[in-house]
């Protein structure tokens, strides 16, 4: 395969809205030590990409930036020292691009909180380009049974909600409450939870999302635009409160309510990060009910392998729509307006 010197990429030079995204010709990078060059075939679009564009997180992003961190493609070149991967391997490029491998966190398989972590599409250029640099240690090998367009959303959305469900400590037959259940992460969380024998209370709005999450195994769907008292509705559905809550909604109000959904002794896992959102937990009831709050922003390398295994076995099926790469600005607009059910996957060939 001939690798070109230049390629098309979606670049933004300043923070702002979809109009700031420009399709430009940029150089194809050379893989360095322990790196590979991946020809990206498909990439998902995540809400984190919107935060990177808008610049509304306290973590600064590099500028100019090529966003994207749900890439699936083929290794076309390997850098010095790479033995794990070879040309032709099908791999995924994730939010976590690399970590140091030597700190106390990496040594405990907690590389997601490595102080030297590099993030695809945020601190380093990501997957909104035809050829992307990936760290050979962190690139995830995609099973042959999983199509690349299916694997793309798993690289962030799937891994993230799978790890968060593990953090919830919810056991078989117990209730997990998922605000934001109809979105890109949420519809996958419903499926992973079902595959892990949890019972699901899904919170979102709209008949299309209700139908979607019920088809994936949610026992209860609560529409936040129709329920007069969401906390009481969750308690009624679960006979006293959920054994765990997974907050995936991008609405700050979800965090104001989430502690109220909880059964005594349960765990609330914070995943989504709406700009400026605060946790609305009454300290008295947090203490008396012995509630636990756990942050979980992404999974590690073994979580990535396990998350793909569920897909390979047919237990999890991303709900997605493939669109041309050229439609990325429109996807940002729809995402900002909360009008996307499931995931949008971009075809880099179009």
Swiss-Prot record:
Superkingdom of the source species: Eukaryota
Q: Which residues form the signal peptide?
A: none
Q: Which Gene3D superfamilies match?
A: Medium-chain alcohol dehydrogenases, catalytic domain, NAD(P)-binding Rossmann-like Domain
Enzyme Commission designation? 1.1.1.1
**Residue numbers binding NAD(+):** 47-48, 51, 183-185, 204, 209, 224, 271, 273, 296, 298, 343
Q: What class of enzyme is it?
A: oxidoreductase
Q: Which Pfam families match?
A: ADH_N (PF08240), ADH_zinc_N (PF00107)
Q: Which residues form a coiled coil?
A: none
Main localization is cytoplasm
Cofactor(s) the record lists:
Zn(2+)
Q: Name one GO biological process term.
A: glycolytic fermentation to ethanol
InterPro entries in alphabetical order: ADH-like_C, ADH-like_N, ADH_Zn_CS, GroES-like_sf, NAD(P)-bd_dom_sf, PKS_ER
User: What is a GO molecular function of this protein?
Assistant: ethanol dehydrogenase (NAD+) activity
Q: Which cysteines are joined by disulfide bonds?
A: none
Tell me how this protein assembles: Homotetramer.
Its family? Belongs to the zinc-containing alcohol dehydrogenase family.
According to its UniProt entry, the function of this protein is described as: Reduces acetaldehyde to ethanol during the fermentation of glucose.
Any idea what this protein is called? Answer: Alcohol dehydrogenase
């Amino acid at each position: 395969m001939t690798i070109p010197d230049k390629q098309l990429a979606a670049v933004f030079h300043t923070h702002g809205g979809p109009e700031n995204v420009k399709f430009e010709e940029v150089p194809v990078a050379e893989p360095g030590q322990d790196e590979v060059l991946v020809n990206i075939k498909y990439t998902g679009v995540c809400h984190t990409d919107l935060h990177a564009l808008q610049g509304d997180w306290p973590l600064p992003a590099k500028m100019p930036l090529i966003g994207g961190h749900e890439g699936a493609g083929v290794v076309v070149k390997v850098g010095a020292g790479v033995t794990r991967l070879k040309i032709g391997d099908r791999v995924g490029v994730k939010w976590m691009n690399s970590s140091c491998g030597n700190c106390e966190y990496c040594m405990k398989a907690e590389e997601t909180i490595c102080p030297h972590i590099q993030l695809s599409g945020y601190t380093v250029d990501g997957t909104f380009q035809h050829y992307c640099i990936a760290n050979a240690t962190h690139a995830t090998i995609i099973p042959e049974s999983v199509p690349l367009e299916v694997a793309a959303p798993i690289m962030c959305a799937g891994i993230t909600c799978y790890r968060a469900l593990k953090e919830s400590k919810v056991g078989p037959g117990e209730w997990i409450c998922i605000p934001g259940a109809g979105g890109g992460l949420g519809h996958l969380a419903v499926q992973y939870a079902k595959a892990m024998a949890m019972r699901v209370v899904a919170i979102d709005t709209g008949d299309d999302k209700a139908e979607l999450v019920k088809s994936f195994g949610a026992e209860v769907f609560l529409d936040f635009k129709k329920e007069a008292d969401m906390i009481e509705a969750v308690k009624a559905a679960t006979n006293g409160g959920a054994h765990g809550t997974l907050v995936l909604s991008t609405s700050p109000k979800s965090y104001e309510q989430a502690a109220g959904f909880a059964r005594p002794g349960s765990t609330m896992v914070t995943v989504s990060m709406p700009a400026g959102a605060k946790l609305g937990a009454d300290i008295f009831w947090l203490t008396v009910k012995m509630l636990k709050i756990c942050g979980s922003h992404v999974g590690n390398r073994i979580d990535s392998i396990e998350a793909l295994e569920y897909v390979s076995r047919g237990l999890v099926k991303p709900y997605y729509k493939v669109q041309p790469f050229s439609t990325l600005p429109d996807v940002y607009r729809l995402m900002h307006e909360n009008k996307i059910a499931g995931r949008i996957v971009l075809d880099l060939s179009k």
